[in-house]
């Protein structure tokens, strides 16, 4: 365990909390100088590129600093679930296929992941998936109406393990407050991580948000709708932990 992990989570979270709007002249989201990701596009395969070029014009939504009509974007009225950082798309595709009665808006900044997700959507005929390739904080802030979401998934975000990088973690007090604002009453925020320090960090921040209520006594059992990933299965066999948190909007 690193020296950073030996520091009390509460003390570190308090330092981050001092960066909330009431402690600064400008809202932290008004200028996105600190982001929770580093844009490393990597190499896109030929198949990913082809599917991206073919599918993104059909299922992609461009970022605009204006409210998005989600029902219009999906062509129907149904519960809307937003997933932040869908990676290569396997989990999102499995959940969307298992729940055709719900619509899924996936956000990912990395091109190969977007291409892979486009491929999965095409191969599985998923009519209930839309994709955005943009900063999720800006999408949430500028395009999602208050109370519009039935759920938000944040699965295995970058833990930013070094203490000096904690400010880059996606789960921060201000962001959780923003997510809670976008959830409909009874809607949920589901986070999952395989990094223990980040798990406790998440738990403390989510528990401190007055609009959210924990559905469990601490960490939650993995909900049936979240499939195990290959990486997660391998880690569990090696004795590594995975922590789920599910909070509902009051």
Curated annotation (Swiss-Prot):
Biological role stated in the UniProt entry: Catalyzes the formation of N(7)-methylguanine at position 46 (m7G46) in tRNA.
Active site: 158
The protein's annotated pathway: tRNA modification; N(7)-methylguanine-tRNA biosynthesis
Enzyme class at the top of the EC tree: transferase
Catalytic activity: guanosine(46) in tRNA + S-adenosyl-L-methionine = N(7)-methylguanosine(46) in tRNA + S-adenosyl-L-homocysteine
Annotated binding of substrate, by residue: 162, 194, 229-232
Family: Belongs to the class I-like SAM-binding methyltransferase superfamily. TrmB family.
Species for this entry: Azoarcus sp. (strain BH72)
Stored Pfam families: Methyltransf_4
Protein name per Swiss-Prot or TrEMBL: tRNA (guanine-N(7)-)-methyltransferase
GO MF terms held by the record: tRNA (guanine(46)-N7)-methyltransferase activity
UniProt EC number: 2.1.1.33
One GO CC term on file: tRNA methyltransferase complex
